[in-house]
């Protein structure tokens, strides 16, 4: 497993755990490229909120099958039908608020929302929020089909938690020479956090992340007990890649 802890307001990386035992694996899961699964849905919703003021967490979408024509993986010149399914294998048909669709990680709605807002806009938003890796402009991107690493994903989530202000991860805060003179100070030498989205977009994203823990059927409800132990607001998003190869919690 890999783990990153980062302060949203400062972008200071407080913990970086590449694996439970580096001597055995010698593989840094923080820097490795993996499919983020449903954790990528945050950028789909962010793009929708940012580019269409009529879309809010209470806007309703129906959980129903959607089929799209996409290039075949083996022969890009040939189109095939792609029909995404929910993790449970079926659609409920429910006309649900986006907040609930995000909390329950409904795949069909994420794909439809991605098509409505435009995949290119989703990519642009993801990059603005902190994703640096190349992203493929395909409908399946809404479900996290392009590889990213854990550090950039956490950094991008921190943008939402910092009210829409982005800053690259800070690993070193200060460097002194042997005489005690400051030769590097991150607060002076690194760019300050800059707004990359409207405040209301970040506010909506924060509400969505809380919904994953607080709404019935939310995918992060396993962390619910912590609400009673800490005087703070908690939220998050889970993600699982194909064949359960990777499991994420941000």
Residue ranges and their predicted role:
Residues 23-43, 58-61, 96, 140:
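Short active-site loop at a secondary-structure junction
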């Amino acid at each position: 497993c890999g783990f990153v802890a980062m302060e949203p307001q400062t972008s200071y990386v407080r913990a970086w755990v590449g694996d439970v035992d580096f001597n055995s694996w010698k593989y840094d899961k923080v820097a490795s490229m993996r499919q983020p699964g449903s954790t990528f849905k945050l950028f789909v919703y962010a793009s929708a909120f940012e580019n269409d003021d009529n879309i809010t967490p209470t806007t309703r979408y129906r959980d129903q099958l959607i089929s799209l024509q996409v290039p075949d993986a083996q022969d890009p010149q040939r189109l095939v039908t792609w029909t995404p399914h929910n993790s449970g294998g079926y659609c409920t048909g429910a006309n649900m608020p986006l907040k609930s669709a995000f909390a329950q990680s409904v795949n069909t709605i994420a794909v439809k929302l991605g098509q409505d807002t435009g995949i290119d806009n989703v990519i642009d938003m993801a990059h603005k929020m902190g994703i640096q890796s190349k992203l493929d402009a395909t409908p399946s991107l809404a479900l996290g089909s392009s590889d990213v690493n854990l550090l950039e994903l956490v950094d991008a989530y921190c943008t939402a938690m910092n009210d829409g202000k982005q800053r690259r991860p800070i690993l070193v805060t200060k460097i002194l020479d042997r005489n005690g003179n400051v030769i590097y100070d991150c607060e002076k030498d690194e760019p300050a956090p800059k707004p990359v989205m409207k405040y209301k977009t970040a506010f909506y994203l924060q509400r969505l992340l809380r919904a994953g823990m607080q709404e019935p059927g939310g995918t992060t409800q396993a962390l619910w007990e912590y609400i009673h132990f800490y005087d703070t607001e908690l939220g998050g998003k889970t993600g699982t890649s194909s064949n359960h190869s990777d499991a994420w919690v941000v």
